[in-house]
């Protein structure tokens, strides 16, 4: 007999765990709603619908609160949720996405009925009629008017959000982003109109209100508003009188309390300006005073509410000015300043989470689109549109950007705006911050609210993270292509051309707006690059949009593009070059910054190109910093020692010096090195070159016969003076030296000195031979008797000379003396001898101090070059390097016999000793230190920017901006940099005068 097993009666209702509910009270809340009381298909569908809410726990809690509210009519709502799928989708979606709208529903429990049935979005006019009707009903009781309007506004937000979100829960239509943004703008218009009606009633009573137009700006003006956003407005009155201003002010107050923050900060003169102006007053302001950003803001202007005729007059008068704004003299400067300001607004710790202002974010798209509109809208009325999406379409249609790029950028923009909407809906707070990367719960909620589902490889949160990376990268890449790809297509070979492409005039306009002062030359350089034969031209076509975009942020994009062309032509045979720029964005970006800032480095890179490969990062940080200057110095000397021919030896030394200069200057320009490290590295390589040259010349001049055959007749030491002795060389510094010799056994002094002088002169001549590299000038004029004295002396001769005839300036010069090359033991003995002169046991004589002061006064009066500005000459100007160094040296002369720490050739270390000994108050020493560092940075930056030694800061303009960047100033605002330089050096000069006594 066959026994049949009874079928298992497995419950069909899913458990809270299967539904994704994690709140410990979830089961209790389900029971409270009675949703586990009936095991039927309707309840199964209901529960699975709840599980699809972005946050089912939040939705469940809101439903329980609603059920506990007497006026909600829970029996009716509960029954409707079982049978009405659209209502279920809308309500669960909005409660699982917005805690704030859940609170609103609990406060207004009958509002759930707005989500029932065939719900559609009202038109602009229908919304205005709703709000007007509410005002008419409420004006009998003005105290309740704004409360009722606030409720109506939140109800309309509830309906929109429910329709916007419903597709996350049920199979409902998806509202396009543009529809949502436009409806939010219509809702804002209706709310503003209602607030204006109430304001007129409050201020004017039964009197006729003044004529007032409210111009919507920003996202509201462009009809692309967020769920939560300030609404930017400008007020235009028939008269700018007290009553009109009171109405405008009252309208702002009412709307800000009831709906959203109303901001009139875009008005002429900003918050300092009059709240209301007439049309004529606006015209006068924009004709005379308005900045470029104010014309950019007018791109979005729209007459929203109030007096329509006034609004029309305002727009008719001002909009033509928008389309000629790019002809203004300061257009490029202001546009670049706006880009920088936007980037600096974002704190570093949240930059990766900023959906609006971060890299590859919304502002990148909006700014680029608006700039292209301003540049090309003058000659193309199809670009006279307000919304970003419409403008992208028009730019693609007009050939100003590729149509595929326009479509991709629009898709990325709408995706990022969708996330922005979802983030704001949660608490109805203005925010643009994505959740923390490790906040799994928040990321998962955002993914579900944005209707992102698992893809088989990742859960919803993982898919969102991948999509964000993809979209940010795409925006960043398209941001560059947006500006430059059409330019390249307009100059490229036939295979690259597109229909409706950009004309040469439009291309020149666009390049000028992007900061190129010579757009015609820039186009020629671009054409030469992309039209190279074979693979190189194709790779350049791919690379250039990104490279040019990065270069446009540099102070001198014209010079940078020329340098890039020269570099590319010089390295045409190096296969690694373009591959590195293509595959390593960090290298390419840093290279563009260097080329667009410096005239000094490009020539070095052409002859030492492998340094470019070090622009990337290694495991321990920037590879430019992996090189040890001391190791470079040893390698340089060793390399030169392999050659018997001095010319070849010095050529080998120059090669390594060139590479080291390129490395140090590149790291300096990229902000990787402190100025003191730069000076030490430059000193190290100079010392190595001196050692290599001296060794080579000694080898070449060894006697061929006689008792000294193959042996040097004398030992030679090179004493570094000035900045070389203090290890404070800059890019444009000469090497101040003295040569000292000591005869070999059996060689008389005169023969030894003759031989050593010949070697020293050959060292100077060989190093000073003109070449394509930065010069190697050796200056021996600080020796006793200056130019009139012998080039080389014996140690005994130096001792006798200093003991008997040392002049005050010679004593002062010895304060910086340091043995740098040649015979180390002889150099050490020279310094011991010099100590007796520069640090005498009883201090220097009062007469010597007076003479130093007199010479300083004469230097101040006579040494400054003709035409130089004494305030901005970094070496001899007020509070410049000479002032600080002479002050330190005077204090050394006065106190070194008492303060051993002053037996030092370094300016900064002596300043530390001066402060430690209390010779000058610490705060004043700090002023001297800051001035020395500031002037040294500026002087180095001048050489980096101009490519040749100079000490005079330029006046305001592009070159000063470049100097500011090269000197490490946080922006390329040359004026700010100059103000800081003047302030720092002025304060230091006061200390200098105090120490010198006059």
From Swiss-Prot:
Its EC number is 2.7.7.89, 2.7.7.42. Belongs to the GlnE family. GO terms for molecular function: [glutamate-ammonia-ligase] adenylyltransferase activity; [glutamine synthetase]-adenylyl-L-tyrosine phosphorylase activity; ATP binding; magnesium ion binding. One of its GO terms (cellular component) is cytosol. It is an enzyme of class 2 (transferase). Transmembrane segments: none annotated. Residues 1-487 are annotated as: Adenylyl removase. The gene is glnE. GO terms for biological process: regulation of glutamine family amino acid metabolic process. This is Bifunctional glutamine synthetase adenylyltransferase/adenylyl-removing enzyme. Keywords: ATP-binding, Magnesium, Multifunctional enzyme, Nucleotide-binding, Nucleotidyltransferase, Transferase. Residues 492-998 are annotated as: Adenylyl transferase. Involved in the regulation of glutamine synthetase GlnA, a key enzyme in the process to assimilate ammonia. When cellular nitrogen levels are high, the C-terminal adenylyl transferase (AT) inactivates GlnA by covalent transfer of an adenylyl group from ATP to specific tyrosine residue of GlnA, thus reducing its activity. Conversely, when nitrogen levels are low, the N-terminal adenylyl removase (AR) activates GlnA by removing the adenylyl group by phosphorolysis, increasing its activity. It catalyses: [glutamine synthetase]-O(4)-(5'-adenylyl)-L-tyrosine + phosphate = [glutamine synthetase]-L-tyrosine + ADP; [glutamine synthetase]-L-tyrosine + ATP = [glutamine synthetase]-O(4)-(5'-adenylyl)-L-tyrosine + diphosphate. Its cofactor is Mg(2+). InterPro entries: GlnE, GlnE_rpt_dom, NT_sf, PII_UdlTrfase/GS_AdlTrfase.
């Amino acid at each position: 007999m066959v026994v049949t097993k009874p079928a298992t009666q497995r419950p069909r209702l899913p458990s809270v765990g299967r539904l994704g509910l994690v709140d410990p009270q979830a089961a209790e809340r389900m029971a409270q709603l009675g949703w586990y009381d009936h095991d039927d298909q309707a309840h199964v569908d209901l529960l699975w619908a709840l599980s699809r809410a972005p946050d089912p726990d939040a939705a469940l809690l809101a439903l329980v609160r609603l059920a506990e509210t007497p006026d909600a009519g829970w029996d009716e709502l509960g029954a409707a949720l079982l049978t009405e799928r659209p209502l279920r989708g809308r309500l669960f979606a909005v409660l699982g996405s917005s805690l704030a709208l859940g609170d609103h529903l609990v406060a207004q429990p009958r509002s759930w009925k707005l989500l029932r049935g065939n719900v559609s979005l009202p038109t602009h006019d229908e919304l205005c009629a709703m709000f007007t009707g509410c005002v008419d009903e409420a004006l009998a009781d003005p105290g309740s008017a704004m409360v009722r309007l606030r409720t109506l506004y939140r109800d309309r937000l509830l309906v929109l959000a429910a329709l916007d979100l419903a597709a996350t829960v049920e199979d409902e239509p998806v509202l396009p982003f543009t529809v949502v943004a436009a409806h939010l703008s219509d809702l804002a218009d209706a709310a503003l109109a209602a607030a204006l009606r109430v304001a007129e009633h409050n201020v004017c009573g039964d009197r006729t209100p003044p004529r007032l137009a409210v111009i919507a700006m920003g996202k509201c003006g462009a009809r692309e508003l967020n769920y939560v956003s300030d609404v930017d407005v400008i007020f235009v009155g028939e008269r700018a009188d007290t009553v009109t201003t009171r109405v405008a002010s009252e309208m702002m107050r009412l709307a800000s309390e009831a709906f959203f923050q109303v901001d009139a900060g875009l008005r002429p003169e900003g918050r300092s300006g009059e709240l209301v102006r007439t049309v004529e007053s606006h015209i006068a302001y924009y004709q005379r005073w308005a900045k470029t950003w104010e014309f950019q803001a007018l791109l979005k202007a729209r007459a929203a509410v109030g007096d329509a005729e006034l609004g029309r007059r305002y727009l008719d008068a001002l909009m033509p000015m928008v389309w000629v704004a790019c002809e203004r003299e300061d257009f490029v400067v202001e546009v670049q300043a706006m880009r920088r300001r936007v980037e600096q607004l974002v704190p570093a710790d949240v930059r990766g989470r900023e959906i609006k202002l971060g890299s590859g974010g919304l502002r990148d798209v909006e700014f680029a689109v608006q700039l292209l509109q301003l540049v090309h809208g003058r000659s193309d009325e199809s670009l006279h549109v307000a919304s970003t999406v419409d403008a992208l379409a028009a730019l693609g249609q007009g050939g100003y950007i590729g149509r595929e790029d326009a479509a991709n950028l629009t898709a990325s923009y709408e995706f990022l705006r969708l996330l922005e909407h979802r983030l704001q809906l949660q608490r109805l707070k203005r925010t643009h911050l994505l959740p923390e990367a490790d906040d799994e719960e928040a990321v998962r909620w955002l993914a579900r609210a944005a209707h992102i589902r698992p893809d088989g490889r990742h859960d919803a949160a993982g898919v969102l993270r991948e999509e964000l990376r993809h979209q940010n990268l795409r925006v960043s890449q398209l941001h560059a292509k947006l500006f430059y790809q059409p330019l390249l297509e307009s100059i490229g070979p036939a295979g690259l051309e597109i229909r409706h492409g950009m004309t040469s005039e439009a291309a020149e306009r666009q390049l000028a707006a992007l900061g190129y002062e010579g757009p015609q030359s820039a186009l020629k350089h671009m054409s030469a690059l992309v039209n190279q034969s074979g693979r190189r031209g194709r790779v350049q076509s791919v690379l250039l949009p990104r490279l040019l975009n990065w270069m446009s942020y540099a102070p001198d994009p014209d010079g940078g593009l020329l340098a890039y062309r020269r570099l590319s032509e010089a390295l045409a045979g190096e296969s690694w070059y373009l591959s590195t720029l293509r595959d390593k964005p960090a290298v390419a970006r840093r290279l563009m910054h260097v080329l667009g800032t410096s005239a000094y480095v490009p020539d070095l890179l052409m002859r030492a190109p492998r340094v470019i490969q070090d622009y990337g990062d290694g495991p321990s940080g920037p590879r430019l910093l992996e090189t040890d200057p001391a190791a470079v110095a040893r390698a340089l000397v060793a390399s030169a020692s392999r050659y018997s021919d001095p010319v070849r030896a010095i050529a080998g030394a120059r090669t390594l010096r060139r590479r080291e200069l390129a490395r140090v200057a590149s790291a300096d320009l990229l902000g990787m090195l402190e100025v003191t490290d730069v000076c030490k590295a430059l000193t190290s390589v100079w010392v190595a070159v001196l050692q290599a040259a001296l060794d080579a010349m000694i080898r070449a001049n060894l006697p061929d016969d006689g008792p000294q055959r193959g042996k040097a007749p004398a030992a030679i030491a090179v004493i570094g003076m000035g900045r070389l002795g203090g290890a404070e060389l800059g890019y444009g510094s000469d090497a101040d030296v003295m040569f000292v010799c000591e005869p070999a056994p059996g060689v008389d002094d005169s023969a030894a000195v003759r031989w050593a002088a010949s070697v020293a002169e050959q060292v100077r001549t060989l190093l000073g031979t003109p070449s394509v590299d930065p010069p190697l000038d050796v200056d021996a004029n600080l020796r006793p008797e200056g130019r009139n004295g012998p080039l080389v002396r014996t140690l005994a001769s130096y001792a006798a000379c200093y003991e008997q005839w040392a002049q005050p300036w010679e004593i002062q010069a010895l304060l910086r003396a340091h043995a740098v090359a040649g015979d180390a033991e002889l150099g050490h003995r020279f310094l011991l001898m010099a100590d007796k002169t520069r640090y005498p046991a009883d201090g220097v004589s009062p007469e010597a101090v007076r003479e130093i002061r007199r010479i300083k006064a004469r230097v101040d009066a006579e040494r400054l070059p003709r035409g130089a500005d004494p305030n901005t000459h970094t070496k001899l100007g007020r509070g410049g390097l000479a002032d600080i160094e002479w002050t330190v040296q005077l204090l050394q002369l006065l106190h070194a016999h008492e303060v051993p720490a002053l037996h030092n050739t370094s300016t900064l270390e002596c300043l530390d000793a001066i402060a430690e000994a209390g010779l000058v108050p610490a705060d004043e020493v700090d002023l001297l230190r800051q001035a020395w560092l500031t002037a040294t940075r500026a002087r180095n930056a001048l050489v980096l920017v101009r490519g040749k030694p100079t000490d005079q800061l330029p006046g305001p303009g592009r070159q000063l901006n470049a100097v500011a960047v090269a000197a490490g100033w946080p922006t390329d605002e040359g004026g700010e940099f100059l103000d800081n330089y003047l302030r720092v050096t002025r304060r230091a000069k006061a200390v200098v005068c105090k120490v010198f006594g006059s």
